[in-house]
Amino acid sequence: MEPPAGAAATVKDPDHDPVKTKVSAPAADPKPRTSSQKAGHSLQDWDTIATVGTGTFGRVNLVKEKTGRQYCALKIMSIPDVIRLKQEQHVQNEKAVLKEINHPFLIKLLWTGHDNRFLYMLMEFVPGGELFTYLRNRGRFSSVASVFYATEIVCAIEYLHSKEIVYRDLKPENILLDREGHIKLTDFGFAKKLVDRTWTLCGTPEYLAPEVIQSKGHGRAVDWWALGILIFEMLSGFPPFFDDNPFGIYQKILACKIDFPRQLDFTSKDLIKKLLVVDRTRRLGNMKNGAEDIKRHRWFRGVEWESVPQRKLKPPIVPKLSGDGDISNFETYPESELDKTPSVSDKDLETFKNF
């Protein structure tokens, strides 16, 4: 089986010297409105150091406390773009979910606010960079490394599900490594509190579960499907279903014909097959015993699950860092053009009055 074109694309080497680029922050409202104001958390208290991530309607900046030594990540979202792309509910969902969760493997939200152009979310800075970068630089992970990351992810997803939250965007790009090498799930824009099944088509094509594609309504089971895709990708270096266009990917997902690379052993393949079951009622993790069925699978043999959330397992990769504000494990980005973002009317701003 050949990986998709570009699967081993060159990405930034995490071992080079940290970038010291100084970028300008957007010219914000001098008195941004905040809905979760805490002492020491306002835009005026932070200096922007560099951009460490970009998205469809904003970016994430590394910021440093002016009067102290704390570094944080500031997510800045353009309100006009959020409105244009009809992402208001996703943004509100992200804030609501982040306010509710507290887990060692999930990113922490510290503060939110807005002015008449931007929404702001101040979060802990996780300096190790994306798991995606390490996976692409190495080609694929060993079985030992894959078990470690899957173990911490299972605990994180199980916790979210216990809170009636479905994550819906599990992929290597959304898994950060902290300074010790433990994971932090980030980007909760697609996360949703479950009251009943949901029908929204969202997520990354290669990781979408069949029931999402078929608009049958979906719940927790989509996260366990994505875990199966992730385990396959960690062990092989590429996802099991790929094509030049999303519709081709969707067709392959629905057919669910998995071509396993030769290096995958029987136990790995058995777990992946049980996670990548089109019928969600038979999918591992979504049956009567829930996540316990996954934990008991022999691929995880030897894992002391009670020690996992205590961060007692030894990480296979420890990020190289020169200091607290080291951004060498992240891509470099061009200087921000956020100052060109127009302001919005009071009517449009009403949607975000409690943000």
Swiss-Prot record:
SMART domains: S_TK_X, S_TKc
Domain AGC-kinase C-terminal: 301-355
Sequence positions bearing Phosphothreonine: 200
Entries under SUPFAM superfamilies matching the protein: Protein kinase-like (PK-like) (SSF56112)
Coarse class of the protein's main subcellular location: cytoplasm
GO cellular component: cytoplasm; nucleoplasm; nucleus
Alphabetized PANTHER family for the sequence: CAMP-DEPENDENT PROTEIN KINASE CATALYTIC SUBUNIT PRKX (PTHR24353:SF37), CYCLIC NUCLEOTIDE-DEPENDENT PROTEIN KINASE (PTHR24353)
Subunit (UniProt): Like other cAMP-dependent protein kinases, the inactive holoenzyme is probably composed of 2 PRKX catalytic subunits and a dimer of regulatory subunits. Interacts (cAMP-dependent) specifically with the regulatory subunits PRKAR1A and PRKAR1B. Compared to other cAMP-dependent serine/threonine protein kinases, does not interact with the 2 other PKA regulatory subunits PRKAR2A and PRKAR2B. Interacts with PIN1 (via WW domain). Interacts with cAMP-dependent protein kinase inhibitor/PKI proteins; inhibits PRKX. Interacts with GPKOW. Interacts with SMAD6.
Name of the protein this chain belongs to: cAMP-dependent protein kinase catalytic subunit PRKX
Gene name as annotated: Prkx
